[in-house]
Amino acid sequence: MPRRGLILHTRTHWLLLGLALLCSLVLFMYLLECAPQTDGNASLPGVVGENYGKEYYQALLQEQEEHYQTRATSLKRQIAQLKQELQEMSEKMRSLQERRNVGANGIGYQSNKEQAPSDLLEFLHSQIDKAEVSIGAKLPSEYGVIPFESFTLMKVFQLEMGLTRHPEEKPVRKDKRDELVEVIEAGLEVINNPDEDDEQEDEEGPLGEKLIFNENDFVEGYYRTERDKGTQYELFFKKADLTEYRHVTLFRPFGPLMKVKSEMIDITRSIINIIVPLAERTEAFVQFMQNFRDVCIHQDKKIHLTVVYFGKEGLSKVKSILESVTSESNFHNYTLVSLNEEFNRGRGLNVGARAWDKGEVLMFFCDVDIYFSAEFLNSCRLNAEPGKKVFYPVVFSLYNPAIVYANQEVPPPVEQQLVHKKDSGFWRDFGFGMTCQYRSDFLTIGGFDMEVKGWGGEDVHLYRKYLHGDLIVIRTPVPGLFHLWHEKRCADELTPEQYRMCIQSKAMNEASHSHLGMLVFREEIETHLHKQAYRTNSEAVG
């Protein structure tokens, strides 16, 4: 063990000494670059025998001065980066020293696992070598290709869109926008201040000055990410009056995995208050309670149900259903709130949240058409934390079973329809109605906006409140949450925007693209089948 400490100390000493020498070398280069020329015989550039005016030489000197200033700024940035790397490496060596001390006590963290590379720069370069940047990789099929996405100064052209993104759009997310701006700036830095090993020659302008590229010279770029290696960028620049393009390849390598935290989460005592706003739709409520009985009463057993019912019609049927469940399963953990007013989902959830009078509780805002599993309830508990996180799962929405299972006499039972396939449903990434959040967070943020009437909109308002706040929003598809198909009616009383959203949702809910296409071309298909049958019969008779 003392021998390991001596080796580590020696490596630390030489590493720090090498970085210090590197800093000194960069500083010396900076002084050489920025020092004025002392050669008295040096003449200003120009063609011998030509008479240039004073303005020409002043412009030329100004260009040279700007070049030196740009180079000086670049060198200063490199010096700052080296200082930062020196500090990071010092901290890393200190961390290794601490780990060595911990290992000496018998509780080493990495044990016999693969050790993190001692030279971080070497590791990052190895990531480039592993990625498919310079040499192609043998792939098993066309599905193994990682496609690029292309971009310009203002637009991104993407393949993976979901249902809310567009084939062409401005980068809305700040991280993506900042990433592309940084990449273009880095590409310009490479072109305007090339290294000696770069395969490019300095081009001169009409007055002999060095060409300086800017962001307006950026033509297009491509990027793709290999999840375990990093992101590759291919950038192309071109001056309007030149025929040649400048091509820059950049790579942002991913570093080694780093532990952020490790904790134990106890969910055995976490009660979920499932809040369901409801108006009429008693048949759907019967189906909902069947799922509730199987999952919540028989399996989970740590659930409270709050039903907020609007209107009088159907209220007695809902009471009867709840009383039947109580008598059959000895379940009493439910609350029925009756509101004699027009249905408003946001109002119902607000009332349901405030109806709970036993302090803090985790709430799941649910609809009567939702089918969930016991595993989802645990995901709900794991991904919501009071004062820190709210959970917005993406629901898998099922298509119209009459279309999906049109080749069967009767659609299969609901339990057999719960599959994640392209023709059976879609991820409802534009929906924010199903959410798990703690009561204190919901009340602190102000709940739902009561100004929103009718269908849709109130969920997005609440979602945006959390996005504008300090809580972490966990947004992810989950396998145990399904939206069952039901016929959707768009009321005439809706605003034009709400009506458009309702019709859009109705169209997306009906069937997949291929199934809708089969419906559109049904007559053409039937005509073809009739012709085939007629031809077959004619050949048989002949």
From Swiss-Prot:
Subcellular location: Golgi apparatus, Golgi stack membrane
Coiled coil location: 59-105
Ranges that cross the membrane: 12-32
Catalyzed chemical reaction(s): 3-O-(beta-D-GlcA-(1->3)-beta-D-Gal-(1->3)-beta-D-Gal-(1->4)-beta-D-Xyl)-L-seryl-[protein] + UDP-N-acetyl-alpha-D-galactosamine = 3-O-(beta-D-GalNAc-(1->4)-beta-D-GlcA-(1->3)-beta-D-Gal-(1->3)-beta-D-Gal-(1->4)-beta-D-Xyl)-L-seryl-[protein] + UDP + H(+)
Residues bearing carbohydrate: 41, 333
Lumenal topological domain: 33-542
Membrane topology according to the record: Single-pass type II membrane protein
Catalytic EC class: transferase
Binding site for a divalent metal cation: 369, 486
Residues in compartment: Cytoplasmic: 1-11
Protein's UniProt name: Chondroitin sulfate N-acetylgalactosaminyltransferase 2
Taxonomic lineage from the root: Eukaryota, Metazoa, Chordata, Craniata, Vertebrata
Gene: CSGALNACT2
